[in-house]
């Protein structure tokens, strides 16, 4: 994408909606400019970064300050017309140079701390997600060169207060906000517009001659397909939370095979017949796990532990500890059954497969051997 693609508005019902950028982009830009200020020993008032999606952002720097081998800078979060709890707040970075050759990244005031398992980050660590961690470290490394080291602290003075308006506490992230964003860009869009844009991608794939499609909730699914299945991601289409809608669109377009690939946190809902997986529609993850564990003969102790979990990842640890990992194959088959039930009035329903994977990109389960599915997708 180019810089113009960020400036171009998103149109919805004849209204131009402005894009924004994530807390991850703010932290990356703040860290980069702070590192540059330490090296150059003069204040910088504008900085550019390239987001993970390839969009170039040129951002204004606020509160720049240099003191010896340390500098501080801030970037103001702008969510565009998709305003959330972090919109308008300052995300700061403090960079201190050293001779270690290593870059360390920590969270300071206003950045949440991970207190529960299940969010993909170590207990006790700052709530700075994987993609922003990578972009922050890469931006600082680019600025300071290969030999120097740096201590990078991300902080947000308003973070603790703003976090009260988020779901962080329910996820066990306490004391502040999370630094997030897999693309770096916030795209405002209504649900119907978003669904239509996803459907358009399906139409383009079908028009190119593809007859088999892999539907994933988001970026992690696409990476799994590429790295673990060895399948061309040309066949991958994001379905977001709109599982039922995208399956129906794939059927309408004449795809002969649909493969659902994702983390259990999303796909497990399909096993319960939930085809819109956003949490504001329905959850039932733990209830679904408990029900199917019970069907497999799991002890009451495990059922109780899983039922008390707040995240799927936390439940998965208990499942592994009790030796019930075979539930994922069972759930994958159940997911396919639910899809076929939904399509029971379809004249020629497609083949349906389901693959569940962990945050570490390991295969957890599938309705049939993954190698067999991958081979068919490569035909």
From Swiss-Prot:
Record keywords, A-Z: Cobalamin biosynthesis, Methyltransferase, S-adenosyl-L-methionine, Transferase
Alphabetical GO biological process terms: anaerobic cobalamin biosynthetic process; methylation
Domain of life: Bacteria
Pfam families: CbiD
Alphabetical list of InterPro entries matching this protein: CbiD (IPR002748), CbiD_sf (IPR036074)
Keyword Transferase: yes
Enzyme class: transferase
Enzyme Commission designation: 2.1.1.195
Keyword tRNA processing: no
Reaction(s) this enzyme catalyzes, per UniProt: Co-precorrin-5B + S-adenosyl-L-methionine = Co-precorrin-6A + S-adenosyl-L-homocysteine
Pathway this chain belongs to: Cofactor biosynthesis; adenosylcobalamin biosynthesis; cob(II)yrinate a,c-diamide from sirohydrochlorin (anaerobic route): step 6/10
GO molecular function: cobalt-precorrin-5B C1-methyltransferase activity
Family of the protein in this entry: Belongs to the CbiD family.
Protein name: Cobalt-precorrin-5B C(1)-methyltransferase
Native organism taxonomy: Bacteria, Pseudomonadati, Pseudomonadota, Gammaproteobacteria, Enterobacterales
Gene that this sequence comes from: cbiD
